[in-house]
Structure formats: structure tokens, C-alpha cells
Amino acid sequence: MVLEMPAARVPAGPDARDVRQALARHVLTDGYDLVLDLEASAGPWLVDAVTGTRYLDLFSFFASAPLGINPSCIVDDPAFVGELAAAAVNKPSNPDVYTVPYAKFVTTFARVLGDPLLPHLFFVDGGALAVENALKAAFDWKAQKLGLDDRAVNRLQVLHLERSFHGRSGYTMSLTNTDPSKTARYPKFDWPRIPAPALEHPLTTHAEANREAERRALEAAEEAFRAADGMIACFLAEPIQGEGGDNHFSAEFLQAMQDLCHRHDALFVLDEVQSGCGLTGTAWAYQQLGLRPDLVAFGKKTQVCGVMGGGRIGEVESNVFAVSSRISSTWGGNLADMVRATRVLETIERTDLLDSVVQRGKYLRDGLEALAERHPGVVTNARGRGLMCAVDLPDTEQRDAVLRRMYTGHQVIALPCGTRGLRFRPPLTVTESELDQGLEALAASLASRG
């Protein structure tokens, strides 16, 4: 005899008005005070499900939404939505169980974003873990080249820059140094850190100071290599530092660091988690700087994070890309994210979107430079590459106040960076009209700063 059990009653979830209260019972809720309407929001416009207020999104979920929210290439294609839903029903372990969507994603990624000199791909969830696995690849490479045993590998080091943000995982915690609250009281490695010679703009005005900053940084790098006595596995840098202040570096400085790595038999590793996937107007920022990295960490806009590898990695035949389980994870990324990323990359390719990024980026940068001219001594250091643009304000307090006024008074969301930087991270599809609204909000917020 089979007993029929009454169906369990599933309690109704919270409605929009209760979201923050429901979350606050269990998680920290110190983010934006809007409740995102996942249906009404579209493109660069985020809608508050409680008030109906529309916000201009110039932060794109911390530079992770390449086409904004609910892009038409996805939501207006019912067949593709079905394909995406089918991929979301299950979560297979991609490194060991293979599917057509996985293969389609990998081939699309290689075609749209790939570098022939970096043929190896590794996928994982999270930008910090992308960097983490790039470091593991570098440690493994260096250890094999030197013939180090398990005890000796503990002497290996990572040369890196001040004001870096590379994540909050194990190895990366020793490299991130933007905000002490993110790294304090966690055990860290004492790895060599050199000054970050961020370019001051306009470049013509600050040429001598910029050259001197680069000279000091290169001297510090030379000394770090000397002191490490051959134990530096790699140099790791963001080609443009994001959270640390939207700090740009000259091609000459980065090329000099690359040359130092070659001379001292260390890998040259770039973190393009924020700057990659078209934000600067090319697939990767390093392509505009004359660089040939050995490893590149990626994430955010790519939807699936990971590492591209090549270059001198091939000097060691049994590198981590060739040996089973040297680097891996259960899921190796997320299949649903891969399906979404495939459509995003196809759209970037089909629409020649990166050409538009170059044009819109110049438009935004010109607007920021005009604001700097109108507010001398207040708005300074207008800078950008593609849509990765920023300005500086006099101090942290004034910067934060301007951002608050942009948000509360003009419904525009931008981001802080460094101690006094204000950065824009719009979707790649942003229009000149939308950039105008953002620039006008910044101008009005500056005018009302008191």
C-alpha cells in the first residue's frame, strides 16, 4: 500500500518591498538601496522594483555586463532563451564531461577574443581564481625550470605593483593592496612590491614627472630581481589598474618590465579581468601596448573567468595546461554562463562593436577633459582608453559626495577608484546621448558641491 503524502506548502517569497529586510536577516546588505527589477530593466537602464525609478547604469555591475542588462540579442530571441534555459537546468563538470554548448563557447571565445600566441585556455568561476591559477601556472613553470623540490618552491615570489587589485583569494591576497580592510588580518606572503608609475594627464604637461616615476619603478624592479636571487616566478600587473585608481601605464614601462622578465627568466603575466573583452576598444588592452604576455587572466565581461596561456610556458613540456589535474575545478566555469557568453561574443563580432567602443570612448574622454578645463584644480587627470575612463577629484570626501549626488539627485551610477578617482564603466553598447546624461550629472553634481 502506497501512502500519499500531502504536498508540502512552499511559502511565498518576499516581494520587492521586503527584499532588503529578508536579505538583512542573513547577509550584509550595504549595497545600493534599489531593488533591481529583472524584467523592466534594459540596456543601460536599471529600474527599481519598489519605486519604479530608472537609473543610468555607468558601472555595468562592476564592468561585468558587456551589453548591459537584458540585451535584445538574448531576450528578444525566444529560441536562444530556450537554449539558455536548457543549459541552466543542469550544472555539468565541464573539465571532465563535454557538451556541444561547451565546445561552441570555446571555439567562439578563441575566434573572437583569442590570441594565437596564447593557445591554451583554462576556465573557472571568479576573477580571483583566474589570477590564482595563472600564478600556479607560473610557479609550476619556474619550479620545473629550476628543478625545485616541494620545500624549495616555497621560496618562489611574485613581483607586483603598488595599488594593485588582483582578488581576495589565497595567493592574490598577498598582491592586492588597494584597501587595507580587504586584506588586513589575513596571513600573506611577503612578496616584492614596486611603485606603480601611473601616468598623470595631460601627458604633455607631466612628461618629465611621468618619466621620473617610471625610472624609479624600473630601478625598484631591478633591485627586486637582484634580491630574489632567481626566485621570482613572474611579474603580475593589470595593464590599467581599475580599483586601485584607474592608473594607466605607458607602453614603454610595461615593455621594459616584460624585457626584465625575459632577462631574469620570469613569466610576464597580465590581469585583464576588468580591462579585457573590449572595454578599451580592443579585445585586450595589452594589444594596444605592444606586449606579448605569457599568461593573461580574464573575467567579468567574459561571463566565464579563466586564463589564456602560451609564450614561454611552452618551454616546459609538462606545464599545467598539458598535465591532468594540475589546475582544475569541479565545474570549470558554468555551462549557462558559457551559453550566454557565446551569444554576447557573437554579437560583439557581428556588430563590430569594438569600433564603436573606440568612438564612444573618445567622446567620453573629450567630455571629461572639457569638465577638467571648466573646473581647474577640482577635476584633474582626465584619462581613458576606450570606455575605461576616469577623472580625479581633490580628495576622497569630495569624490564620494559627488558620486552620492550623481546617484540620488540624477539617478546615475558611477564608481569610485583609488583614493580620489571617479570612474565610468558603461556597457559597450552605450550611446553618446547616454554618455551626455552621465557627463551632465557629473557636471551638475560638481556645481552643487558647495
Swiss-Prot record:
Cofactor requirements of the protein: pyridoxal 5'-phosphate
Enzyme class name: transferase
Cross-referenced Pfam families: Aminotran_3 (PF00202)
UniProt binding sites for pyridoxal 5'-phosphate: 127-128, 274
GO molecular function: L-lysine 6-transaminase activity; pyridoxal phosphate binding
Residues carrying N6-(pyridoxal phosphate)lysine: 300
Protein name: L-lysine-epsilon aminotransferase
Lineage: Bacteria, Bacillati, Actinomycetota, Actinomycetes, Pseudonocardiales
